[in-house]
Each structure stands twice: as structure tokens, then as C-alpha cells.
Amino acid sequence: MNPILYTVHGSHLYGLAHEHSDRDTYRVVLCDDKRYISHMIDDVSDSTEIHFDRFVGQVNKGVPQALEALYSRSAVHNTAYLPYLRSLRPDPYTVADTYWRTALNFAVGDFKQKRHAMRLVLNLFDFMRDGIFDPELRPAEVAFVNRYARLDAQAFHVELQSFLEYALRGVI
């Protein structure tokens, strides 16, 4: 397999890891099977490996995990593919739709899921403004997602809806 992109992923990428967090990784490869995807989990790690073409398809669909890997400052790239990776520009409306649905799905969950919903809102806001985002949260952003994730379900849903609408102002 020919590696194209490798990055830490999940809580270690977002800056939300704690002492018991597993180590998530995301790797994009070239291999014979264009449908290839592998997801392996054990006690200490969670690794995703995906064919380059399938990865590009996920980027174009606005899949959060693919966009986070694409925009990760921690990523190691095969330099031959770096210009192409940097040229990828998913459709903002597609990204907005995917992030909206995903954030609302997370909204009904526990603290960790609500934190992910708020993180997606921050990423969506930056993406809609700049066409790119940094999945690595700053300390103030970590405090922001943690504060809102502590709200009860009803208050959280109201706040999330408001932040989503703000992120998409001028689009919806």
C-alpha cells in the first residue's frame, strides 16, 4: 500500500484527549481495491485506513472525519499528492448539510457527543467563512465546547440550533 496521508485523529487531534483516551489515527492509501476501508479498534487505539479515491469521495460529501484529516496540521503527506490534496474544495452547501445533520444527531447524546456537536459547529463556521478549518481546537474553543456540552438536553438543543444558524448565515 502506498501511503498518501497520515494523521492523528479523534480526541488527540481535537485537543480533547484525557489520560484514558485511546489513540485514533487516520491513514489514506493507494491500493488495488478502490473500495478499501479498514477500521480497527483495540484497547489503546482506533485506526481508520481508507483508499485515496474513497477518501476524496468522502471529502466531496463533507464527511467530518475526512475533512478533519484533510485539514489536520498534524498530517504527514506524500509530497507527490500534496498539491492535489490542497486543491480539494468541497461544495459548501454539501458540507453545511452534512455538518448540520451530524451535529443534530450528536445533540441527543451524552456529554461527549454534545461536545462533538459543538466542535462541528466551530468547524462549520470557519469552513463557511474561509473554505477551510482547523480541527485542532484552541484552549478557548475547548472551554467553549465543554461549557455548552454541560447544558441539559433542551437548553443544549436550543443553543446548538442557534449556533448552526449563525454558522450558516447568508447560506440558509
Describe each model-derived feature in a short phrase.
Residues 1-19, 32-172:
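The feature captures the alpha-helical scaffold/lid subdomain characteristic of nucleotidyltransferase
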